[in-house]
């Protein structure tokens, strides 16, 4: 089974279930092998860091942890609503290009 995720880095998404339900954020990282995404401001965890050249004193840092990709839904840039993603082919010169579209308003997302 292919390791595909329906969102890309830089997309604005909304969390649809769990502790952070309803929270919006930008996708920082996509982990297709794990089927997870890291969303800005969602699933903040504290991590203990040993002293190293980057952080000589060590300590506790807060950072975003990955969540399952199935728990987020893309927000359409035009209608500003959470939406499913459709695909369409558009003609670009002599070749066809596959683009993502909003299922609610039909607008091309990327």
Curated annotation (Swiss-Prot):
InterPro entries: KOW, Rib_uL2_dom2, Ribosomal_uL24, Ribosomal_uL24_CS, Ribosomal_uL24_KOW, Translation_prot_SH3-like_sf
UniProt GO molecular function: rRNA binding; structural constituent of ribosome
Cysteine disulfide partners in this protein: none
GO term, biological process aspect, one: translation
UniProtKB keywords: Ribonucleoprotein, Ribosomal protein, RNA-binding, rRNA-binding
UniProt superkingdom: Bacteria
GO cellular component: ribonucleoprotein complex; ribosome
Family annotation (Pfam families): KOW (PF00467), ribosomal_L24 (PF17136)
PANTHER family: MITOCHONDRIAL RIBOSOMAL PROTEIN L24
Protein family: Belongs to the universal ribosomal protein uL24 family.
Cross-referenced NCBIfam families: rplX_bact
Subunit structure: Part of the 50S ribosomal subunit.
Function per UniProt: One of two assembly initiator proteins, it binds directly to the 5'-end of the 23S rRNA, where it nucleates assembly of the 50S subunit.
Protein name: Large ribosomal subunit protein uL24
Organism: Caldicellulosiruptor saccharolyticus (strain ATCC 43494 / DSM 8903 / Tp8T 6331)
């Amino acid at each position: 089974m292919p390791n595909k995720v329906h969102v890309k880095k830089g997309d604005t998404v909304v969390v649809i279930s769990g502790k952070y339900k309803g929270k919006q954020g930008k996708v920082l990282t996509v982990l297709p092998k794990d089927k997870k995404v890291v969303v800005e401001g969602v699933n903040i965890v504290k991590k203990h860091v040993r002293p190293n050249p980057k952080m000589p004193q060590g300590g506790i840092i807060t950072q975003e942890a990955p969540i399952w990709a199935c728990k987020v839904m893309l927000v359409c840039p035009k209608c500003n609503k959470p939406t499913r993603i459709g695909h369409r082919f558009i003609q670009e010169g002599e070749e066809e290009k596959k683009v993502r579209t909003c299922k609610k308003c039909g607008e091309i997302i990327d």
